[in-house]
Amino acid sequence: MEIKNLTTEQRNPASIHIDTVSTVEMVKIMNEEDQKVALAVGNQDEQIARAIDEAANRYKKGGRLIYLGAGTSGRLGVLDAAELVPTYGIKPERAIGLIAGGPGAMYKAVEGAEDDTNLGAEDLKDLNLNSQDIVLGLAASGRTPYVIGGLEYANQIGAFTISIACVKDSEIGKHAEVAIEAVVGPEIVTGSTRMKSGTAQKMILNMISTGVMIRQGKVFENVMIDVMPTNSKLVDRASRIISAVTDATQEEALQTLKKAENNVPLAITMIKTESNKDEAQKLLEQYNGNVSEVIKNN
């Protein structure tokens, strides 16, 4: 499809006079348009769930989350990858963001980089892509050559491929095992896909990466438990987390945390299953470190 015919490139009737209205009215128009984004993302629930389930399986076997995009889409991928490290305590090499043109393109556009089909494949080759990896290709327009080239190569290797676009029947979707297409409609400012399209992509990435981490057992109930209490403030926070999900007093939680050598999931398991450190450790090993599964089955 030609660029001019893409939904993301059409003029939005709701904002056609946005340059002449009051500032309050301008903001209202933006808010009303943004409300459509969540509905568009909601229409992709089944596809997003499919992406999470398979990505979680691959990740559990040692696969990496690898994000691939250009411009705003690339920056959103880099952002999601970077935030997983401090949020869930994963190693930086398990979540990697690739942007057309390299790291410098995060701050300044690199002309022509997104139009190079070979570049996407080359960037993945440099990471020694393997069949357990998960490649998320992002393009609001659904047609970025850099992303298409990367997805094609990932498919050849046997990696799990996911595409995230904001148009229907996208080109990148034809090169992905799971195609997510949140059709948000024309942008408030014509063609400015950092707006509604960017918001939709961020929401979808939040869902996928959070879902994958939940399936790794890094969340118990709705609390992040894979925290590293490396100082007194974090030890206090960890003990409060343990207390909140076990109904133990904070003092009991703190004592158990010490016995567990500052391992929060282990401390929670010890309290919830009324077991000692060694017994709790065996249970966690039996259920791949997933506290929720331990509690459900014991």
Swiss-Prot record:
EC number: 4.2.1.126
Domain SIS, chain residue ranges per copy: 55-218
Pathway(s): Amino-sugar metabolism; N-acetylmuramate degradation
Active site residues of this protein: E83, E114
Reactions accelerated catalytically: N-acetyl-D-muramate 6-phosphate + H2O = N-acetyl-D-glucosamine 6-phosphate + (R)-lactate
Gene name of the encoded protein: murQ
Subunit structure: Homodimer.
HAMAP family, A to Z: MurQ
Highest taxon of source: Bacteria
Family classification: Belongs to the GCKR-like family. MurNAc-6-P etherase subfamily.
GO molecular function terms noted in the UniProt entry: carbohydrate derivative binding; carbon-oxygen lyase activity; ether hydrolase activity
Reported function: Specifically catalyzes the cleavage of the D-lactyl ether substituent of MurNAc 6-phosphate, producing GlcNAc 6-phosphate and D-lactate.
Example GO BP: amino sugar catabolic process
Alphabetized NCBIfam families for the sequence: N-acetylmuramic acid 6-phosphate etherase (TIGR00274), PRK05441.1 (NF003915), PRK12570.1 (NF009222)
Gene3D superfamilies attached to this UniProt entry: 1.10.8.1080, Glucose-6-phosphate isomerase like protein, domain 1
Keyword Lyase attributed: yes
Lyase among keywords: yes
The protein's name in its UniProt record: N-acetylmuramic acid 6-phosphate etherase
Keywords carried by this UniProt record: Carbohydrate metabolism, Lyase
Note: A lyase-type mechanism (elimination/hydration) is suggested for the cleavage of the lactyl ether bond of MurNAc 6-phosphate, with the formation of an alpha,beta-unsaturated aldehyde intermediate with (E)-stereochemistry, followed by the syn addition of water to give product.
